């Protein structure tokens, strides 16, 4: 069975946000959603355990591994991948509901390179933003700042982070998160520029020409 075609809309903005662990993606994503209330966050399904403060259905849909695998068999994911021993996936229903909402003009996906590659294969017009740490030592320091994780887990995440950064050229934009406010302003600028692209607003220009009164 092939993936169902999703409703199309020239001005509906689809954005991938990706980064290695510790680059500040989660914080930046929350700020962007506050700045752009007409964007929706794609809530992924995952088999990992919730972290302190995370809410089921808001941060992730937390599911058992067998339930996740059943959804895979039923082709209910636009993308899915295994990261750090846990499964993550983007449900087709997330995008379908967002596009059916007249108040929604776009969706943000918080996914890694594996998932981004799968989504872009099905949605080639999607915009990809990759967030970089200022230096690798700073990234390691941030990872070690997570008191809930052991040094073994930190080293594994650091190794995966290096492999993630190797795929930087896949993305359309790179944002260095040395200063959170500066990084946010740059990402905000990217979204504003994307909304003004000719391909998104061509229908507006064409309607002006079509409706122009004769002189």
Where in this protein do the model-derived segments appear?
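NTP-dependent small-molecule kinase module
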Residues: 2-4, 148, 166-215
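Conserved lysine of the Walker
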Residues: 25
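Extreme N-terminal, non-catalytic leader segments
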Residues: 1-15
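Post-Walker A alpha-helix
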Residues: 28-29
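Post-Walker A helix-loop "phosphate-sensing" segment adjacent to the P-loop in P-loop NTPases
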Residues: 34-42
């Amino acid at each position: 069975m092939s993936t169902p075609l999703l409703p199309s809309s020239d001005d509906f903005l689809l954005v991938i946000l990706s980064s290695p662990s510790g680059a500040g993606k989660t914080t930046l994503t929350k700020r962007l959603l506050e700045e752009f209330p007409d964007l929706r966050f794609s809530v992924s399904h995952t088999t990992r355990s919730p972290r302190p403060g995370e809410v089921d259905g808001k941060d992730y849909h937390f599911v058992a591994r067998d339930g996740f695998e059943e959804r895979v068999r039923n082709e209910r994911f636009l993308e899915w991948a295994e990261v750090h021993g846990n499964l993550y996936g983007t449900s087709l229903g997330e995008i379908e509901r967002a596009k059916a909402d007249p108040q929604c003009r776009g969706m943000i996906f918080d996914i890694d390179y594996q998932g981004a590659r799968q989504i872009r294969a099905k949605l080639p017009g999607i915009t990809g933003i990759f967030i970089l740490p200022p230096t690798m030592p700073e990234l390691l320091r941030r990872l070690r700042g997570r008191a809930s994780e052991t040094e073994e887990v930190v080293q594994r995440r650091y190794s995966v982070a290096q492999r993630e950064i190797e795929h930087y050229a896949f993305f359309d934009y790179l944002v260095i998160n040395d200063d959170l406010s500066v990084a946010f302003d740059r990402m905000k600028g990217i979204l504003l520029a994307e909304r003004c692209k000719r391909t998104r607003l061509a229908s507006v220009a064409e309607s002006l020409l079509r409706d122009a009164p004769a002189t």
